Amino acid sequence: MKLKDIMSREIACLSAEDTVEKAAQLMKSYNVGSIPVCAQDSVVGIITDRDIALRAIAVGDDGYLQVKKVMTANPVVGTPDMDVDDAVRLMSENQIRRLPIVENNSLVGMVSLGDISVEPKLQEDAETALKNISKPAANRFS
């Protein structure tokens, strides 16, 4: 199965100059946990709800902080013709739950572990990826 068969095609995109408040509002509106950051149609970053919580709110910054200050630049991306198994491996290796899908340098979709897990044939792959992504860091709180 290819990513184009399961990817979400209706996706929001932010500019690096947008605020984290706008990012949070879009996440709420689209009911998602991450939004790609684009310059024209090219993906230059990704911002997640976790980025906002840890890199903005937890350090006392307000909602007017620019997305570029908290986003992950140059995110890992997939392509529409990538096999789902390859995407799961890529997500596992990079410990990411969401993968922007790019074709000819343009954002065309998004795939999450949730998209993969709802496909009956792919549930085991999604479970494996989630286990790998969710491994706790050793002695994180000691």
Summary of predicted features, one role per range:
Residues M1-E10, T48-V77, D81-S92, S112-S142:
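Tandem CBS (Bateman) regulatory domains
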Residues I6, K22-L26, A39-Q40, A58-D61:
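Short hydrophobic/aromatic-rich motifs at helix boundaries and adjacent loops
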Residues S8, E17, Q40-V43:
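Low-complexity, intrinsically disordered short peptide segments enriched in small/polar/basic residues
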Residues C13-N31, G78-Q95, V102:
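The conserved cystathionine-beta-synthase
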Residues E21, C38, S42, V67-K68, ...:
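Residue-level detector of alpha-helical recognition elements and their boundaries
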Residues M27-Y30, I35-R50, M91, L99-G114:
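A glycine-centered beta-loop-beta connector
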